[in-house]
């Protein structure tokens, strides 16, 4: 029998979804630690906080299943309390209260002070940048804005995250300096829309100015850009990328589709011609830039012709990095008023075809790297290999560089120089040269 009065509470934060959720969990954990709480990330704890995702169906299912798993553990006496926060809770709180009432309390995306109070902690305004990072020690996510003002028809993010709100440059720099002091060498800048940064605060797109301030932070060696938007992209960012070696020649810019009829229905504010020109301008401005994009197939009304236009365009553009997802019909979005008329098996078949095509493109591009020298950062040791990345690869989603651990010891979290000896579609094999 438990003697709860003698037991010290341990808070386990479970994170689901995207890098923005990772960041939010780290902020929560930093606040809890500052209040003297024993807090862990995805380990054993008698109090559980689940930071959920509510973006698409698969993510919602994972979040619901995780909630049910911990509610069952609560009923079995394995945990004492279960709290739920994040996007699913923001979007569906009334439904969740009705369907899963055994959760102790639900909190939305803007209710951090309330969540902390429920956990017996105080919200401290002065804790700018005091996060408890959960990523490997060499990199960290740095959120520069919250929310989104774009009207994309398929996307529920504005419902869960609200309007775009930029973080002041001064606050971002303070956070970056604190991360660097902890040994972080790579900053991955994230937002729903990086290209909008500054419009609300400074009345102009200010991403380039932010980058120029960040490169001055001592200890930071790489700065990576995630989640740009093709409309209104501030081209002065490319000037900074060319000029400053700390800015990775890498851009994650989700393009979603390329058929003009689908782009119009998606309310993306661009066309195939404009998008293609933008990408070609990127290539001219930064010749060795790696472009990552994501695509959606099976959007309402997507015909075989629309799909073939997309497929041929992927062949033409030869993206270095690409992900493809099937359309998810989301309540309260503009596209929800359209008929979800592409069968699920057709959606999946199209997504598989795009990824098979990308696998071949990636293999061909990787063959060109054999014999070349790259600076890599070592993220971890896994089995018989040290696993690293070049500046052209983001954690978890891109290529990895594998170094035979039996031949050379390299320190995790550090940079080293390697020569590529072999290449697969999404992996590079290398030997250390210095």
How does the language model describe each region?
Residues 202-215, 235-249, 302-320, 344-349, ...:
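Short, electropositive alpha-helical surface patch
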Residues 54-59, 184-209, 213, 217, ...:
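Conserved glycine-rich "GG(E/T)P / GGGxP" loop and the immediately following alpha-helix
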Residues 16, 151, 155-162, 222-231, ...:
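Conserved strand-turn element in the central/C-terminal portion of the radical SAM core barrel
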Residues 1-197, 236, 247, 251, ...:
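Proteins enriched for Cys/Gly/acidic motifs involved in redox and nucleic-acid/cofactor modification
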Residues 337-434:
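Terminal RNA-binding accessory module
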Residues 44, 149, 258, 381-383, ...:
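Short strand-connecting beta-turns/loops that link adjacent beta-strands
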Residues 172, 189, 225, 253, ...:
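Conserved, mostly hydrophobic/aromatic
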Residues 181, 208-209, 216-223, 234-295:
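Radical SAM/AdoMet-radical enzyme domain recognition
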């Amino acid at each position: 029998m438990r003697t709860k009065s003698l037991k010290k509470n341990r808070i386990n934060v479970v994170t689901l979804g995207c890098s923005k959720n990772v960041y939010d969990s780290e902020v929560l954990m930093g606040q809890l630690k500052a209040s003297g709480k024993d807090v862990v990330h995805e380990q054993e704890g008698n109090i559980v906080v689940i930071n959920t995702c509510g973006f698409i169906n698969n993510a919602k299912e994972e979040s619901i299943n995780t909630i049910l798993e911990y509610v069952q553990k609560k009923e079995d006496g394995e945990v004492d309390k279960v709290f739920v926060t994040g996007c699913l809770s923001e979007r569906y709180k009334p439904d969740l209260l009705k369907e899963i009432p055994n959760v102790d309390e639900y909190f939305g995306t803007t209710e951090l002070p309330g969540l902390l109070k429920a956990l017996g902690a105080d919200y401290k305004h002065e804790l700018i940048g005091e996060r408890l990072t959960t990523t490997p020690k060499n990199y960290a996510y740095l959120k520069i804005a919250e929310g989104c003002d774009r009207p994309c028809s398929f996307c529920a993010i504005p419902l869960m995250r609200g309007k775009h709100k930029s973080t002041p440059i001064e606050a971002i720099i303070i956070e970056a300096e604190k991360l660097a002091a902890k040994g972080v060498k790579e900053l991955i800048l994230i937002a729903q829309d990086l290209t909008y940064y500054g419009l609300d605060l400074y009345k102009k797109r200010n991403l380039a100015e932010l980058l120029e301030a960040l490169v001055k932070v001592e200890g930071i060696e790489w700065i990576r850009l995630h989640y740009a938007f093709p409309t209104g992209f501030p081209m002065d960012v490319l000037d900074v990328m060319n000029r400053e070696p700390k800015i990775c020649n890498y851009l994650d810019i989700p393009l979603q589709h390329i058929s003009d009829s689908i782009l119009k229905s998606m309310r993306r504010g661009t066309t195939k011609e404009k998008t293609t020109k933008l990408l070609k301008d990127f290539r001219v401005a930064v010749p060795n830039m790696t472009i990552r994009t994501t695509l959606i197939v099976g959007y309402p009304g997507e015909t075989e012709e629309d799909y073939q236009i997309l497929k041929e365009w992927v062949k033409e553009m030869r993206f270095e990095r690409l992900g493809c997802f099937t359309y998810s019909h989301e309540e309260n979005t503009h596209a929800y008023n359209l008929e979800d008329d592409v069968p699920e098996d057709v959606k999946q078949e199209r997504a598989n075809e795009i990824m098979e095509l990308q696998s071949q493109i990636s293999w061909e591009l990787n063959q060109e790297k054999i014999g070349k020298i790259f600076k890599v950062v070592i993220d971890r040791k896994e089995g018989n290999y040290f696993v690293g990345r070049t500046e052209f690869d983001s954690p978890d989603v891109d290529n990895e560089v594998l170094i035979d651990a039996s031949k050379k010891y390299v320190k995790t979290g550090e940079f080293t120089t390697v020569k590529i000896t072999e290449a697969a579609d999404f992996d590079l094999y290398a030997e250390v040269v210095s």
